[in-house]
Design a protein with these regions (language model features):
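Non-catalytic DNA-recognition/assembly elements of restriction-modification systems
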Residues: 1-17, 131-147, 158-203, 324, ...
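Sequence-specific dsDNA recognition surfaces
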Residues: 5-20, 30-59, 191-209, 223-252, ...
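Short coil/turn segments at secondary-structure boundaries
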Residues: 20-27, 118, 186-189, 206-214
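A short beta-sheet element
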Residues: 33, 52-106, 221, 238-299, ...
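Active-site/binding-pocket entry motifs
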Residues: 37-40, 69, 88, 111, ...
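Short, solvent-exposed loop/turn positions at domain surfaces
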Residues: 50-51, 157, 244, 311, ...
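A short glycine-rich beta-alpha junction/loop motif
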Residues: 66, 80-87, 118-140, 259-260, ...
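Short amphipathic alpha-helical signal-transduction/dimerization elements
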Residues: 105-109, 113, 153, 299-302, ...
């Protein structure tokens, strides 16, 4: 049987410094918090003063967030300072392949999550963290495993970059044909969204009748509006659920638009007749607009429209606000030309996405094989 070692016997884990809000300024070294690692921060603070040398991080340092959001990262953004709730890993106890260690910890994040404590700020206590065990083969085997997994990760990243290039290509084509819609650089006629089709919002069937959620009709939440075409919802409902609630059946080819909080102006086009909850608005377009063109028109104007949201804690839109939004309208034949271009690009994207999904399955299988 493969030898196992405790994380606490492999390395020393140095917690970051508890910087105070008043320590954060605009000059000096960046203060790295958990949200700066996860990509959810748009507000990097800086510290220009003396600090414990142990909380300094540099390229190549391995970091582990252990509170609120668990994760393992290899730092690559230059000299910085580590905030509390993140460990810097010092490999000072035994010889270990650092990349192998990162993959092993990544695999064990779910086990760590199960050991988290706390009502508000969930965290894993140091004792539980130290006691987590990982397989510990020879140095040669560690390197072999790390190299194999890195190759698969690189393929995954390359596939993701391919998908991003397709998105960039579509946006470039849009601007080439229609200009910048926020500034209406092509001087197109302006129309309100209310004039471009029939509008409605969704609803939620009663949860006290579980049978309502045992049907085969897609019922979307705003959080599921992540792709151009919607392929299927997490929850399904029955025809009776639609008849006895505020939800409605929207036609295939309609566009769902999220209205609330972080899902505001997330969008997706229905491939099948479907329903949604009350957090979604829906437009069934008239003959003046091609729905694929409208999707991209709204994507291009998304940030402009989001700036008009209401609410202090939750920045929300509502159906009336969305219907009142005004957009430049291109000629229908140009819309159709753009839509045909998108469909061709989408065929290529589907192939790359399939390859990405298969590579991700391979990675997950290898992780299970090596660390499960």
């Amino acid at each position: 049987m493969m030898e196992q070692k405790r994380l606490g016997d492999i390395a020393t884990y140095i917690n970051g410094y508890a910087f105070k809000p008043e320590d954060r300024g605009t000059e000096g070294l960046p203060i790295i918090r958990i949200q700066d690692l996860t990509g959810n921060s748009y507000d990097v603070g800086f510290y220009n003063g003396e600090y414990p040398k142990k909380v300094e991080i540099n390229n190549g340092d391995v970091l582990i967030s252990w509170s609120a959001s668990l994760g393992v990262y290899i730092w690559n953004r230059g000299k910085a300072l580590l905030n509390q709730h993140i460990f810097k890993v010092a490999f000072d106890k035994i010889e270990v392949n650092e990349q192998y260690f990162v993959f092993a910890v990544e695999y064990n994040l779910k086990e760590m999550e199960a050991k988290m404590h706390g009502a508000t700020m969930k965290h894993i206590i140091k004792r539980d963290f130290d006691n987590i065990k990982i397989p510990f083969p020879s140095a040669e085997k560690q390197k072999e495993i790390a190299d194999i997994l890195l190759k698969v990760v690189n393929i995954i990243e390359n596939r993701k970059q391919e998908l991003k290039k397709f998105d960039t290509l579509v946006k470039a084509r849009f601007v080439e044909l229609f200009g910048n819609p926020v500034y209406n650089t092509n001087d197109l006629p302006i129309r309100s969204l209310n004039e471009l089709g029939n509008w409605a919002s969704g609803g939620t069937p009663s949860r006290t009748v579980p049978e309502y959620f045992e049907g085969n009709i897609d019922w979307y939440s705003a959080g599921e509006l992540n792709t151009l075409f919607l392929e299927g919802s997490v929850e399904k409902i029955t025809e009776e659920a639609i008849e006895k609630s505020a939800t409605k059946l929207f036609k295939a080819g309609s566009l769902l638009i999220g209205m609330y909080d972080t899902a505001a102006l997330k969008m997706g086009i229905l491939k099948e007749d479907s329903a949604s909850n009350q957090a979604c608005a829906c437009i069934t377009p008239n003959d003046e607009v091609n729905i694929i063109w409208l999707y991209y028109e709204l994507q291009m104007m998304k940030e402009y429209f989001l700036s008009q949201r209401r609410g202090v804690r939750q920045k929300n839109l509502n159906l009336g606000m969305i219907k009142a939004f005004k957009i430049p309208i291109a000629k229908r034949d140009q819309q159709d030309e753009f839509s045909d271009f998108v469909k061709q690009v989408d065929k290529s994207k589907v192939k790359v996405q399939k390859a990405l999904d298969e590579t991700q399955k391979l990675f997950d299988s290898l992780m299970q094989q090596y660390f499960g």
